[in-house]
Amino acid sequence: MSNERKTEQLTRKIFKSLGYYDDKNVIVEEQISDNPIIQKLLKSASKKGSGMGKPEFIVQLLSTDVLLVIECKAKTSNHKSAALDKFAEYAVDGAILYGKYLSKEFHVISVGVSGESEETLRISNYLWIKESFSPIELKIEKICSKQEYLSIIKGTNEKKEYDIKNIKKNTKAIHKTLRETIKITDELKPIIISAILLALSEKSFADSYNTATTPKSLLNLMLTSIRNKLESIESMPEEKVKIMMRNFQGLESINKLSSNKKDDKDFLNIIEKVKTEIWPFINTEHSFDYIGEFYKEFLSYTDGNKKGLGIVLTPNHITDLFCELANIGVNDRIIDPCCGTGGFLISAMNSMLSKTDDPQIQRRIRRDQLIGIESESKMFTLAAANMIIRGDGKSNLYNASCFDKEIFTKVKSTHKPTIAFMNPPYSQTDDGGSELDFVLNMLNLLEPGGLGLAIIPINCVCSLLDKEVEKREKILEKHTLLGVMSMPTTLFYPVGTVTAIVIFEAHRPHNSQIKSWFGYCRDDGFVVSRNSGRIDRNKKWEEKKALWVNSFRNREEIKGFSILKAVTAKDEWCAEAYLQPDYSQINEKKFQRAVEEYFVYKALYSSRFEEIGEEDAEA
């Protein structure tokens, strides 16, 4: 006769072997928890449809928001059902049900265990990310240690997406407090956040900031901690320290931050919010540019047109895409000549670090292989802080124009970049000229055979005006066009810039007889959400990215998506010009979308159409 108690005893034995019972930061409970939050969540989670849910085991990993919930069945034939909806009869089904209820407040590992002996034991694991709608099946057939489970959760795309969603939500809340309570100026908003994050990376400040009695003494403590942090960095040039400190000291001009009122806790509360709501998400393995996210949030409340200022920050999934397109290796040296808040460099660093476990190589990557140039002093400060917080041991950033001849020579000879990524400032004249100047300069910085990738307005590669054709000719005289990807029209939502990614091999003149690859990458799977911006709601991005990357790398021609074409500077560099329409795929919805995209494009670049004139149009 089957006996479920045997299965439970085997589970206890596994817990004991993994140290669960001996770990003071782990609580193993059976059927009922003393935790009032868990009690409340399981109040109506019965497998029979009503009443209290009572899992065989509830494991709390203290100091985290992670739970394990385990359901046992004696017979392996009762391990799991095909539809996972027979909660009372099957181990996995029941564990998933409990996980659904508990995931309102926790990340939950739902574990189904069946069998009455070690030889017949079956174990399945499913992960519920907090506030998610469905679980993820983990291809793991054992109960893992606490650290293994935490690492598994941390490494999932779903957990990263959850973290990003929370960073964005917390960013909005912190910005609201800065705007309404501290009344800080627009230009200093991102500065104060980067200052707080940099100061919190100093243990002495993180442990003592709440002892400051006034806003002024707290600001002084923060600035002193930042200076100590910067001066402790090996080979950090004094000039860079001065530039950064000059920008951080600009916070002294804010009345609320220079107050001697002992009962004014607003500044302290901001630091507390950053520490509790942002800092926990920060680690050197995460490619999300959180300082860039703050910057974008602040821009949304800034007077004036963001595109008019030339400010268009690159979405996180696109900076990661660049790394895959370039197939970055641990020995590559990456440069971004217009690095902004450092988004491309962060993604490149994480891509390289993920490819080696050697501490010496990882240290070399952080210290020597990431180079950035940024002309705007405050933006330079944000980028430098961003990299330092992530363990960049040297911060090879230059506060200068990438066109500065002295800087150009120094960077090229000292760092010898092999890969370049760039999202240059976008021209306010819609003529596409200035962006192509940046592209040429970027390619000239590279070592022979290096790869240069840039995301630029699509009119730079499609315009047939003499000015733009001449600039493209200058590029092709020295460098080979490998490929162009036409990007989604809403990629930079709410800014209406329509873009393309260009990919070049440096210092190999373009052969117009050899075909380049063109991809119609208008659909990345993201949708526009009123409150969250563009999001991968339907989880399509990974599949789309694989298609884009593999098609480019393998130079594949896919009907309706990609094509190989030999081009010169006088041709249009975009898939739309050469792909044959697949009429079988056209329906009313797609036709309407195409018309809408055309009107967006024409509205954005109407001045270019007018400049071409009737005579050119007829030609």
Where are each of the predicted segments found?
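Conserved catalytic cores of phosphodiester-cleaving nucleases, focusing on short active-site segments
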Residues: 57-59, 66-80, 98
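A conserved structural/catalytic subdomain of Rossmann-like adenosyl-cofactor enzymes
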Residues: 62, 77-78, 86, 136-149, ...
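Short amphipathic alpha-helical segments and their helix-coil junctions
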Residues: 79, 165-184, 273-279
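Long recognition/docking surfaces used for binding and targeting
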Residues: 194, 198-302
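Conserved S-adenosyl-L-methionine
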Residues: 308-429, 436-437, 449, 457-459
